[in-house]
Each structure stands twice: as C-alpha cells, then as structure tokens.
C-alpha cells in the first residue's frame, strides 16, 4: 500500500480529475474504452437474450450499485434501505463482495468480525444494521449461504453488484454523486462501467454542492447528513461537529470520494486540514503520528479498520446518515411485493 499522500493517492487524484473532462488522455484511451464497452455489452446481452440464466435465490433482491468507478454513497444508502425495509415489515439480509478481504467462499460477517476478513463496507453494514451479512466474490453463493443460515430473511440487499448479472434481481437502484457520469466515457477513458443509459428502476443522486437533479426518469435526491462525532476509544463520548470549529482539525478519509467527506465537514462550519488516503487504505500503522493537531476526524468506513491497538486520543469518527425519499421507499416496497426476481 502506498503511503498516505504518496504516488498511489496522487495517481488516483489525477485519474479522477481526468475522468471529469474530455482531454487528450481521455481521447487517447477511447479505443480501449470501445473494447471494454463491447465486452460489457456482450455480458449483458448473454443474460438479456437468455443465453445465460440468472440464478433466482428464492427471495427478492435489491441491488444498490453504480455505473461509475469510485464512491458515490452506496454504503449509507444500503444501511438506510435495510432500516426502511425492516420498518416496512421485511426481514432483510445483505450480501457483498467483501472488497479488500481475503474471501473465497461464502463468509458470515458479524459486528465482531475483522475488516481484513470481511471487508470494511460489509463490516460497517453489519455493525450499523445488525442484519445478517454474508460476503463472497460470487454473490449468488453468498445469497444462498445467507438464506440457508437465516431462513427468515425475505429480501436480500446486494451492496454493489450491479454488473453481477448472474444474481437475479427484482429492483436495481443506481447511486451517483455530484460527478454524475464524469466525461461520459467508459473505462479506462472515463469513469463509466456501463453507459449512463443503462436500465434501472430508480436513480439516487447525492449532490452536496448544488442539490440539483439531472433530468432522468425516476430520479431522487439522496441526502447524506453527518451526525455527532464519537470518540474511537470511548464510543459513548460524543461531540457535535460545531465543537471542533475552533480546534486544529485534520480530516482524513480512505474512501472512494474523500472530497465529499471534506465538503461535509466544511458545510458544518469546520476548516480542517485534509488528507485523502487511498481507497480501502489498510492502516497498517498510524499515519497521523507527526500531525500537530487537536483532533483527527475520520469516516466510519475507516474506523472499522482500526483495532484495539490504536491508542490515538485525537481520533473521532463522523457517522453519516442517508435520508431516502419516501417515494423511493414506496416504489421499492411496491416492486418487492408485486414482482418475483427476474
């Protein structure tokens, strides 16, 4: 893993910038994007035409994913959706790939799991929702194992996996942030895994800057709101973000879109020094030992990777809550009660 702010982090930042414009590099990579698009289209067509059959795992599946590379707010969306489905009378479970974990077979994730064995996002979901969570690169196998272990589960939420066509699904939700589709090019010329025109049941847009929604059908605003920060060593100790306004604060994030976290803190009245870490940064050691600050604010996704050996009293965790549009929840519930997986 590259050091914080090192070559890998700088490369990620440059690629992200290039993907927002149609510069010389993007145009030079378009032949490769065409090849990528052709391969992706062939995979989609194989399932759409019935040449390959998706696997029905026996209960409805809601896929929460994106068509772009990088963080868009999927994890807080999954957490909020699980809570909403439970409130609507369902018993939800969650499956995920377990990115960053050495997982080859279906594995249960509990609040006591380690991020290195479960993946940071699945572990966060397990801790926040207390729902059954299973991980495996093969999401079908994960869903089948989850159902075998928890026969009361009557709906499965797939954290990402939009392009995992083998898993039959009832509802597809696509999440965007303010960058939307960037320059509109497919990988590697742009950030798109699939064309923006890809079918989905609903689109969620998290734009903390303008709040504007694109003119797409069935599009809903996704609001991500920070809560009171809690102390890493003493989770019961909480402070409103406003209390950090007059302190020397470092904000650090090893997520797909760290600038969104920093913007959230600025909107709360803070003026932190910022440090973007590589996505899924492992925190093998403490990268903050030389920082002369009063407080270090990190994301929940990063916090699950910090074990009991971390003893930096400056570390505070900023939780984020996703507010789902009631109309979106009603749409999902209606589809779950009225349709079978396909």
UniProtKB/Swiss-Prot annotation:
GO biological process, one term: lipid A biosynthetic process
Name of the protein: Tetraacyldisaccharide 4'-kinase
A GO molecular function held by the record: tetraacyldisaccharide 4'-kinase activity
Major enzyme class: transferase
Family matches, as Pfam families: LpxK
UniProt pathway annotation: Glycolipid biosynthesis; lipid IV(A) biosynthesis; lipid IV(A) from (3R)-3-hydroxytetradecanoyl-[acyl-carrier-protein] and UDP-N-acetyl-alpha-D-glucosamine: step 6/6
Stretch forming the signal peptide: none
UniProt GO cellular component terms: plasma membrane
The keyword Transferase belongs to this UniProt entry's keyword annotation: yes
EC number(s) stated in the UniProt entry for this protein: 2.7.1.130
Reaction(s) catalysed (UniProt annotation): a lipid A disaccharide + ATP = a lipid IVA + ADP + H(+)
UniProt keyword terms in alphabetical order: ATP-binding, Kinase, Lipid A biosynthesis, Lipid biosynthesis, Lipid metabolism, Nucleotide-binding, Transferase
HAMAP family the UniProt entry points to: LpxK
Binding site for ATP: 68-75
Family: Belongs to the LpxK family.
Function: Transfers the gamma-phosphate of ATP to the 4'-position of a tetraacyldisaccharide 1-phosphate intermediate (termed DS-1-P) to form tetraacyldisaccharide 1,4'-bis-phosphate (lipid IVA).
């Amino acid at each position: 893993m590259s050091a914080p702010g090192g070559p890998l982090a700088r490369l990620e930042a440059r690629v992200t910038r290039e993907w927002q414009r149609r510069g010389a590099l993007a145009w030079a990579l378009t032949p490769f994007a065409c090849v990528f698009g052709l391969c992706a289209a062939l995979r989609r067509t194989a399932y759409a035409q019935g040449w390959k059959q998706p696997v029905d795992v026996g209960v409805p599946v809601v896929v929460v994913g994106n068509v772009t590379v990088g963080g868009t707010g999927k994890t807080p969306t999954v957490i909020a959706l699980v809570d909403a489905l439970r409130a609507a009378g369902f018993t939800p479970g969650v499956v995920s790939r377990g990115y960053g974990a050495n997982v080859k077979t279906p594995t249960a994730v509990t609040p006591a799991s380690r991020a290195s064995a479960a993946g940071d996002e699945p572990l966060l979901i397990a801790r926040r929702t207390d729902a059954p969570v299973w991980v495996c690169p093969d999401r079908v196998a994960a869903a089948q194992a989850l159902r075998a272990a928890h026969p009361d589960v009557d709906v499965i939420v797939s954290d990402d996996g939009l392009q995992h066509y083998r898993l039959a699904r009832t509802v597809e939700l696509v999440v965007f942030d303010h960058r939307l589709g960037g320059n509109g090019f497919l990988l590697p010329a742009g950030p798109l895994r699939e064309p923006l025109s890809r079918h989905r049941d609903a689109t969620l847009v998290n734009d903390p800057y303008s709040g504007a929604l694109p003119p797409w059908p069935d599009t809903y605003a996704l609001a991500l709101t920070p809560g009171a920060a809690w102390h890493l060593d003493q989770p019961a100790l909480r402070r409103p973000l406003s209390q950090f306004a007059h302190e020397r604060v470092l904000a650090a994030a090893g997520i797909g879109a760290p600038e969104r976290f920093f913007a959230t803190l600025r909107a709360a009245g803070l003026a932190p020094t910022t440090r973007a870490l590589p996505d899924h940064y492992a925190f093998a050691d403490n990268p903050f030992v030389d920082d002369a600050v009063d407080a270090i604010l990190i994301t929940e996704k990063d916090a699950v990777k910090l074990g009991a050996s971390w003893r930096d009293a400056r570390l505070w965790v900023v939780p984020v809550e996703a507010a789902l549009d009631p109309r979106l929840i009603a749409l999902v519930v209606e589809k779950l009660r009225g349709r079978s997986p396909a």
